């Protein structure tokens, strides 16, 4: 005899994507707000900043929620004067990375 055949199971893993990201400054504090889709597959976010646009360093770690579909996240930081560039590294539960666009904040002198 022959062995019975079964349909092959495939697992699809939807990856989270940035819907929007914006940065504002008020009262010497930067506020970054970002929205993502497929939120339940996001693990964490690394908020990175740079003064020269080339060398980014970790400013904060934000953990994802288990909320289904989309969700919004925020980051606040006190800043001095000058130009600061921010980007967000999204790390999903499969350890895949995606970077947001870069947000430029100009703090008053």
Segments the model singles out, each with a brief description of its role:
Residues 1-109:
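Short, compositionally biased serine/threonine- and acidic-rich segments at solvent-exposed termini, linkers
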């Amino acid at each position: 005899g022959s062995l019975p055949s079964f349909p092959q199971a495939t697992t699809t893993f939807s990856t989270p994507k940035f819907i929007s990201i914006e940065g504002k400054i008020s009262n010497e504090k930067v506020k970054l707000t970002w929205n993502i889709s497929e939120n339940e597959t996001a693990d964490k976010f690394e908020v990175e900043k740079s003064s020269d646009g080339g060398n980014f360093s970790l400013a904060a770690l934000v953990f994802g929620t288990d909320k289904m579909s989309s969700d919004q996240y925020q980051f606040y930081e006190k800043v001095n004067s000058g130009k600061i560039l921010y980007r967000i590294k999204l790390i999903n539960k499969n350890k895949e990375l995606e970077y947001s666009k870069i947000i430029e904040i100009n703090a008053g002198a």
